[in-house]
A protein has these predicted regions:
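AAA+ P-loop NTPase catalytic core and its hallmark functional loops
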Residues: 1-5, 10-234
Length: 234
């Protein structure tokens, strides 16, 4: 799969269509599932789930990249804001290549729905979806799933696994929760070292809708900054 670009020439990786084994460094789920970092609760610089919401062309995807890299590197937003942009983009692509950041274009994955996101039946077998596979392979350090341009119906991808998104339901917490997936009958958990960063257009995702998920997601508004143009002749 070839890369593409979003916004002001920011490179992204079309990770949805890449063969997982060629990207992710932990093909053995049995080894990854026992790694202690999956239960680590010590990292508190960022929420487990962030939804960046704003009008078109206000830098939502750029903010998502900054957030994802900050999570991986353990740098807060103030530190990330003074990082040279080319360095941030280089690090972002490096983490995509290493399998620490998974970029998902929501319109692409939405066409497959739950089947492509969590799991699907393939004859007598069950095939893992991209979200389930990535979550199961989280081992040392931290991992980020970036979901770009979600819409009002995006939570339908999670179905029964949506309950696992809350911070206090993750692995290693006092209320750690597992759900039994309906197709594979497997017990599925979300590790504490997995973070979700999503973007949405404020016109598409109305306040009444995003308000319904504010217990699970920290909603970060992004607004235009017309003052930047003050005094400029355009």
């Amino acid at each position: 799969s070839s890369g593409s670009s979003t916004g002001a020439g920011i490179p992204i990786a079309a990770s949805v269509s890449i063969t997982p084994e060629s990207v992710w460094p932990y093909p053995d789920n049995a080894i990854a599932s026992t790694h202690p970092d999956r239960k680590d609760q010590s990292f508190r610089l960022y929420p487990k789930n962030t939804l960046i919401k704003g009008p078109v062309k206000t830098g939502k995807f750029h903010q998502a990249i900054m957030t994802a890299v900050g999570i991986i590197e353990g740098k807060d937003s103030n530190m990330m804001n003074i990082e040279p942009v080319p360095d941030v983009l280089e690090h972002y692509q490096q983490y995509v290549d290493e399998g620490r950041i998974l970029h998902i274009s929501y319109p692409d994955i939405n066409s497959d729905g739950y089947d492509g996101f969590i799991e699907r039946k393939c004859g007598p077998f069950t095939e893992d979806g991209i979200f389930k596979k990535f979550a199961n392979q989280c081992a040392d350090g931290r991992y980020v799933i970036m979901m770009e341009e979600v819409d009002l119906n995006w939570m339908h991808l999670f179905r029964e696994t949506a309950v696992l998104l809350r911070e206090n339901r993750r692995e290693g917490t006092s209320s750690e929760t597992a759900v039994t997936l309906p197709l594979s009958k497997e017990k599925f958990r979300l590790p504490s070292n997995l973070y979700i960063v999503a973007t949405c257009d404020s016109i598409v995702c109305e306040d009444t809708i995003t308000g319904a998920i504010d217990h699970d997601f920290f909603i970060r508004p992004v607004s235009p900054e017309p003052e930047i143009l003050h005094g400029m002749r355009i």
